[in-house]
C-alpha cells in the first residue's frame, strides 16, 4: 500500500542542495520521511547516489539498526520490482558498510581514523560509568584539598556563600553541574570564561550590550505580542452582537497601555519599562448592566483580560523586578564567588582530562570534542575546516541526522 505524504513531507523528501531542519511532534513520521528521502536520493533517475555516500546519524543504536533495516527492506522491494537494476544491486552490497550510525559512533569513527592528528594513543578505550564516577571523585577530592590549602580569595568567597557549615557538597555539585554544561559546548574553556562577562560589567552601558539583555528584549516583545492579541480579541467581542460593549472603555485603556509599553520597549529603556509597569493602574471593568448583553461573552472578555494582566505581572516580576542600577550592584556582589566557581570548574576539567589520559580512557563528551578538534581549526572567532574535514566533505554527498539534543552544542 502506497504511503500518501503531506505537502510538507513531500518538500522534506524532494528538496535538494540546501540545509533542511525539520521540527515535528513525536509520532508524526519524521523517521519515515527521512528514510523516504534517503531512498529518493538512491533511486533518483537523474542523480542517483550510492548509499555509502550518505552519512546518516540517529540518536540511539537501536534507531540506527532499525533505520538500516528499513532502508534494506525498501531497496529489496525496489529490486524485486526491477531485478535487473545494477544500481540497486550495488546498494544491497554497499549498505553493509554504509555510515548509518549514532552521533557518538561517528565521532568514534573519526577518532579511529584520524587519531594521529591529535596525538592520541590509539589503544584508548571508553570508560565505564562507574569508573568515571570514581575518577571524578578522586579528582574533586584532590582539587578541593589544594584549593583549601591555597586559600585563594575567590575560592574562600565561594565557600562562604555556598558551602554549609557541615560539608562542601554544594560546592562539589555546583562544579560538576557547571562542568557538564561547559562540556556540552563546542569550546568549553571559552564558554566558561564567557559566563563571567556579565559579572564584570562596570557601567549600565556595558550591561545593556550584554547578550542576555538582547534575549530579555526578545522576551518582552513576545509578551507584548501576546497581550496585543488578547486585547484585540477582547475588543472584537465587545463590538460583536450582544457583546459587553460596556467593557470597551477598559479594554481601550489597556490597548493604550500596551502601546506605551511597546514604545518604551522599542527604545530599549529598561528602567523606563519597569516604571511604566510598576506605576500602572488598570481601568476597572464597568459595573453597569444591560440585559441584552450575552453573559458568556462578558465572561470571555473577563477571562481574556485576566490573561492579559497575568502577562504584565509576569513581565514585571520575572523580567523587571529590579532597576538596572540594582542589578549592576548585585552582579558586582556575585562576581568574586562566581569567579571562584568558574576557575575551580576549569581546574577540575583540566585535572579530570589529565587523569583520563593517564589511564588512556575517554568518555562520550571527550569523543565529541576530539572529533571536533580533528575537524575544525579555530583562530579567534574564525572556524576553518581541517584537512580531515575537507576529506570527509568529499566522501559524503549529504549528512542526515534523525534526531539530536539541542543542549549538546558540540554536536549541533
Where are these regions (language model features)?
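ATP-hydrolysis module of ASCE/P-loop NTPase motor domains
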Residues: 31, 92-99, 117-187, 332
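Core structural elements
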Residues: 98-110, 161-184, 341-347, 362-375
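P-loop NTPase Walker
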Residues: 1-119, 355, 359-365, 370-373, ...
Amino acid at each position: 500500500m502506497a504511503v500518501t505524504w503531506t505537502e510538507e513531507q513531500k518538500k522534506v523528501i524532494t528538496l535538494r542542495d540546501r540545509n533542511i531542519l525539520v521540527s515535528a511532534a513525536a509520532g508524526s513520521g519524521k523517521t519515515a520521511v527521512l528514510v523516504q528521502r534517503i531512498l529518493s536520493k538512491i533511486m533518483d533517475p537523474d542523480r542517483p547516489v550510492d548509499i555509502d555516500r550518505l552519512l546518516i546519524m540517529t540518536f540511539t543504536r537501536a534507531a540506527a539498526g532499525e533505520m538500516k533495516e528499513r532502508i534494506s527492506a525498501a531497496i529489496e522491494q525496489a529490486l524485486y520490482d526491477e531485478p535487473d537494476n545494477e544500481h540497486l544491486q550495488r546498494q544491497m552490497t554497499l549498505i553493509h558498510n554504509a555510515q548509518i550510525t549514532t552521533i557518538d559512533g561517528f565521532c568514534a569513527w573519526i577518532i579511529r581514523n584520524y587519531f594521529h592528528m591529535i596525538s592520541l594513543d590509539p589503544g584508548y578505550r571508553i570508560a565505564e560509568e562507574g569508573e568515571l564516577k570514581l575518577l571524578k571523585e578522586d579528582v574533586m577530592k584532590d582539587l578541593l584539598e589544594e584549593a583549601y590549602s591555597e586559600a585563594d580569595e575567590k575560592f574562600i568567597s565561594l565557600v562562604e556563600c555556598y558551602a554549609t557549615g557541615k560539608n562542601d557538597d554544594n560546592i562539589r555539585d555546583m562544579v560538576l553541574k557547571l562542568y557538564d554544561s561547559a562540556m556540552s559546548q563546542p569550546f568549553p574553556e571559552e564558554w566558561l570564561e564567557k559566563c563571567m562577562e556579565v559579572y564584570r560589567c562596570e557601567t549600565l552601558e556595558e550591561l545593556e550590550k550584554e547578550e542576555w539583555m538582547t534575549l530579555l528584549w526578545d522576551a518582552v516583545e513576545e509578551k507584548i505580542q501576546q497581550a496585543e492579541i488578547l486585547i484585540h480579541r477582547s475588543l472584537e467581542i465587545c463590538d460583536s452582537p450582544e457583546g459587553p460593549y460596556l467593557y470597551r472603555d477598559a479594554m481601550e485603556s489597556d490597548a493604550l497601555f500596551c502601546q506605551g509599553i511597546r514604545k518604551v520597549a522599542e527604545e530599549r529603556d529598561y528602567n523606563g519599562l519597569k516604571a511604566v509597569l510598576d506605576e500602572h493602574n488598570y481601568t476597572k471593568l464597568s459595573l453597569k448592566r444591560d440585559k441584552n448583553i450575552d453573559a458568556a461573552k462578558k465572561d470571555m472578555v473577563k477571562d481574556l483580560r485576566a490573561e492579559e494582566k497575568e502577562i504584565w505581572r509576569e513581565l514585571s516580576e520575572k523580567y523587571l523586578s529590579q532597576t538596572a542600577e540594582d542589578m549592576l550592584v548585585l552582579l558586582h556582589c556575585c562576581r568574586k564567588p562566581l569567579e571562584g566557581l568558574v576557575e575551580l570548574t576549569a581546574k577540575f576539567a583540566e585535572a579530570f582530562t589529565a587523569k583520563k589520559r593517564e589511564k588512556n580512557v575517554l568518555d562520550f563528551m571527550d569523543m565529541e570534542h576530539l572529533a571536533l578538534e580533528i575537524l575544525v581549526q579555530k583562530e579567534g572567532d574564525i572556524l576553518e575546516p581541517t584537512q580531515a574535514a575537507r576529506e570527509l566533505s568529499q566522501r559524503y554527498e549529504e549528512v542526515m541526522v534523525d534526531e539530536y539534543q539541542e543542549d549538546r552544542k558540540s554536536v549541533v
